[in-house]
């Protein structure tokens, strides 16, 4: 019986590598493609555009004796290097600046949450989207009527900015 158990153990250990992956079980902190929505009060159209954001897992620790000791600071996935892209919202009322700037992640790293450029809140029940008026996907085939060309939706990005 012991020999059978040993043989079974060897068989399980030798085939265990076939199930294991060299990649981490959860994706680590890195830039990922995302669709964000841009809107502004006074502009009737919400524009969705593709960008990169920082997302993924950072290692963290939890104290066993939480009631006695203070909680440990938790790492979150932050922007390391970023640049800003300007999106022009079509159909804005006169006197309303139609340009909205959005971040584009160039690189990411784990660290303490910095409220100056990160959303440190918990998960939301609803996805981020437009609160005002109509929705216009920047990748749709039909651009808004008042644009002379679809390239007016995206303006050139500023040079890279490294948050402090």
UniProtKB/Swiss-Prot annotation:
Keywords: Disulfide bond, Glycoprotein, Hormone, Secreted, Signal. GO terms for molecular function: hormone activity. Belongs to the glycoprotein hormones subunit beta family. PANTHER family: GLYCOPROTEIN HORMONE BETA CHAIN, LUTROPIN SUBUNIT BETA. Transmembrane segments: none annotated. The lineage of its organism: Eukaryota, Metazoa, Chordata, Craniata, Vertebrata. Heterodimer of a common alpha chain and a unique beta chain which confers biological specificity to thyrotropin, lutropin, follitropin and gonadotropin. This is Choriogonadotropin subunit beta. GO terms for biological process: G protein-coupled receptor signaling pathway. Its main location: secreted. Disulfide bonds join 29-77, 43-92, 46-130, 54-108, 58-110, 113-120. Residues 1-20 form the signal peptide. Gene3D superfamilies: Cystine-knot cytokines. Stimulates the ovaries to synthesize the steroids that are essential for the maintenance of pregnancy. It is found in: Secreted. One of its GO terms (cellular component) is cytoplasm. Residues 135-164 are annotated as: Disordered. Placenta. PROSITE patterns: GLYCO_HORMONE_BETA_1 (PS00261), GLYCO_HORMONE_BETA_2 (PS00689). The keyword Repeat does not apply. Glycans are attached at residues 50, 140, 146, 151.
């Amino acid at each position: 019986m012991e020999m059978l158990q040993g043989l079974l153990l060897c068989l399980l250990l030798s085939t265990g590598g076939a199930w294991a992956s060299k990649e981490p079980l959860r994706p680590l902190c890195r830039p990922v493609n995302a669709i964000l929505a841009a809107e502004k009060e006074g502009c009737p159209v919400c524009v969705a555009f593709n960008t990169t954001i920082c997302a993924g897992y950072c290692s963290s620790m939890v104290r066993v004796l939480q009631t006695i000791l203070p909680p440990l600071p938790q790492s979150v996935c932050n922007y390391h290097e970023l640049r800003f892209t300007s999106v022009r919202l079509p159909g804005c009322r006169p006197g309303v600046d139609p340009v909205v700037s959005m971040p584009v992640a160039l690189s990411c790293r784990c660290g303490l949450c910095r409220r100056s450029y990160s959303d440190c809140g918990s998960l939301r029940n609803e996805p981020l989207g437009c609160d005002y008026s109509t929705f216009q996907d920047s990748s749709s085939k039909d651009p808004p009527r008042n644009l002379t060309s679809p390239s007016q939706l995206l303006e050139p990005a500023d040079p890279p900015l490294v948050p402090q």
